Amino acid sequence: FDSLASLSVGNGEFAFTVDATGLQTFPSMYSKGVPLGTQSQWGWHSFANPQGYKSEEVLKAFDFGRGHEELYACQFKEEGRQKEASDWFRVNPHRLHLGIVGLGLSDGVKASDITDIRQTLNMWKGEITSHFTLNGNAFDVQTVCHPDQDMISASVTSRAHAGVNLRFPYPTGAHADDACNWDANDKHSTTIVRQDAQSAVLKRVLDETTYYVTLRWEGKANLAEKSKNYFVLT
């Protein structure tokens, strides 16, 4: 596993980045490299603004010799409301990580347990092909993104059983990290709003932001909540 060698599929409006398993099974290993993101052009979020900061509070007048003063948004450094307002606008809005989708391997499995890794990205087809071995069982994974919709599809072939883990983070608001705050479960929620034998719809609520995630699968499987904002498909 190379934290700088993650691969992505996307369509210009949506992108999904994977590790060597073809999904986002070990995201923490990539958090300091090229993170395993699921992001879209529409997926933005703002933290709560209980102080009611307004954009005009961060404007400052400058005279550039054009016969009139011009207003520009600035980062204020002096302590006080203007600094607090500029700090808030500096991180809001920010792009959302829409969710981690990883293989549900046996408990205790580490990345170092995975061997015989072979992975390629066919840029012409927009397909990631991943092969690896775990506990003597070979896994072959094909990962693609729909050309026109915010949708990914993965095919997993193996004699061993592997489910799918879905974890949803709260955003960090930072500019150079993996966009995942895993220590703020009280600030967002994920609920199953519809489920049948081969599909489910999840509702995500983060402050004033709401979006939905649709899941579809082939064969017999069950989606269940493992813990808050964490679901498993087995």
Please give the residue ranges for each predicted region.
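Beta-sandwich/jelly-roll carbohydrate-recognition scaffolds of carbohydrate-active enzymes
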Residues: F1-T234
